[in-house]
Amino acid sequence: KSTLLHILGGVDRPTSGKVFVDGQDVYEQNEDELAVFRRRQVGLVYQFYNLIPVLTVEENITLPIRLDGRKINQERLKELLSTLKLVKRRKHLPSQLSGGQQQRVAIGRALINAPAIILADEPTGNLDTENTRDIMKLLRESNEVYRQTMILITHDREIAMQADRILEIQDGRL
């Protein structure tokens, strides 16, 4: 499942087959173009956060924008921090956060750009019931407002049932 997300998100190259986004084969791009594609078009939520330990919550969330040399939309950042319940933690480092808070930072980083594609590997796996509900609401709203394609991997049947389309992988087969 993680390999599938990495291939779809331009992180790992497939050994065979092609990945098309907006009619373009993603892997016909060189590494620099692929990096821009990932920063601008894909929001990745990893199962184990992948936060930069020396960056604050705010800096981790805005990393894709800063790597692109673009101006940060402070209203969007403020809105995300509020929704993610991280306003009071915005200057904290990942080591100063709980696992659930770190996951919310990772989700914020994936959503900050309003990318065309959101790829989420167990985005609510480390969250309590209330935060799970809030995150799923945020993902649904983002999907509707920005008309994003969202691929979410979960073992939680209740979360899966919220999807427009459900595909199951069993024993390595779709």
Predicted features along the sequence, with ranges:
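Conserved switch/coupling elements of ABC/ABC-like ATPase nucleotide-binding domains
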Residues: D171-L174
